[in-house]
Design a protein with these regions (language model features):
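Charge-rich, well-structured scaffold segments of protease-associated domains
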Residues: 59-205, 253-365
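His/Glu-rich zincin catalytic helix
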Residues: 1-61, 163-255, 357-365
């Protein structure tokens, strides 16, 4: 991987000769507070990322895949090897330079409301979005606020949010695939687009004392049975993002269940697991995993990442930009894991052991 002007490029041959242009933006379902230019506190509409996603789908068409997470929205634009640089420049112009298409935006607003109303009836979707209240409490997320915000969001508020948040300082770019050469002139064009807006943006929140966070249990009626377990990890402020990531990757691997969702940002760290039955998972974190568990996890993670880059570049690219937005370089993480020995890991894990709290959401017909 090579980096020019804060854009990371990775040459990898894929049989379809495609290039995967990936933009990660530090906005998501749970991003409420931002600090603009180190002085202005901006309160974001919680529905902004979902409406932005639908607007981009209407604007960019079939060649784009968009994923909206809790703090990161990822846009993957596929280009052909022969024309990827021109496509890349056009893509950046659409994101950063072109004016908002108001008619498309109105369609995106109405479509977002209709889609949310439809999926909200699904118990698993509702449980997941409800679980963020526990997992992302330090960022001020509430499901009720998201629902209200979606109804309140209008063109003027969206355009204002776009100008403040869709800027290069709040984004990460990663280009992966069958890359042909990029000239100095083309790099200058790209650099000029990215430097067109120079404000700084930082995700906001409040680091509450994890000792004050209680366990919780929520029961709701639903059209289907759902069991969801949420583990929240309260790290000390001095623990680095890299150490948090290593800890979460290794320690959560021993948790039973399916559809695990690990999340890490500056304010919250969590694991959300869908399980067959209601379980108590806190006890798994009373001590670091054993040497044999460590070896299995280490091999499993290396194999998974290698499989992603070979067979699932979209998933791989999403991981890379999300890590970059958390100031973690994928190559550094991989190098750290390769060199990491169990004795060193156990020592680090015992020192940074977080306070683990747990919530369960049970939905029954």
């Amino acid at each position: 991987m090579r980096t020019y002007d804060d854009i990371e490029y990775n040459y990898h041959e894929y049989p379809n000769n495609e290039v995967y242009i990936t933009l990660g933006i530090n906005i998501g379902v749970a991003t409420r507070y931002f600090l603009i230019d180190s002085k202005e506190v901006y309160i974001n509409n919680l529905a902004f990322a979902n409406v932005f996603s639908n607007y981009m789908k209407l604007l960019l068409g079939e060649r784009v895949i968009i994923d909206v997470g809790r703090t990161v929205t990822t846009i993957i634009y596929t280009a052909d090897k022969s024309n990827w640089v021109n496509d890349f420049i056009c893509f950046l112009n659409i994101i950063y330079i072109n004016d908002i298409d108001v008619d498309l935006l109105k369609n995106a607003l109405e479509g977002s409301k209709a889609k949310f109303e439809r999926v909200y009836k699904d118990g698993e979707f509702r449980a997941l979005y409800k679980s963020y209240e526990y997992a992302d409490t330090n960022k001020g997320y509430k499901l009720h606020d998201l629902i209200e915000n979606l109804q309140e969001l209008n063109v003027e508020e969206f355009v204002n949010g776009y100008k403040k948040l869709i800027v290069s300082d709040n984004c990460s770019l990663f280009v992966n695939g069958n890359l042909s050469g990029i000239s100095q002139k083309e790099r200058e064009k790209i650099d000029n687009i990215l430097k067109n807006i120079t404000c700084t943006v930082a995700l906001g929140g409040k680091l509450n004392n994890p000792l004050l966070k209680d366990n919780a249990h929520l029961f709701e009626l639903s059209r289907q049975d759902v069991n969801m377990d949420i583990l929240s990890f309260g790290f000390e402020k001095t623990v680095s993002m890299m150490d948090k990531m290593i800890y979460l990757l290794f320690e959560t691997d021993k948790i039973p269940g399916y559809s695990k969702e690990i999340h890490l940002d500056e304010f919250d760290s969590s694991l959300i697991v869908k399980t067959e039955e209601v379980l108590k998972l806190q006890n798994y974190f009373k001590r670091p995993e054993t040497s044999s568990q460590f070896d299995i996890t280490k091999a499993s993670l290396a194999g998974k990442y290698n499989q992603w880059i070979e067979e699932n570049p979209i998933r791989f690219n999403m991981m890379v930009v999300e890590m970059r937005l958390n100031n973690i370089a994928y190559t550094e993480l991989l190098d750290t894991m390769v060199k990491l020995q169990y004795e060193d890991y156990a020592n680090i894990a015992s020192k940074i052991r977080p306070i683990v709290t747990e919530a369960q959401i049970v939905m029954r017909r």
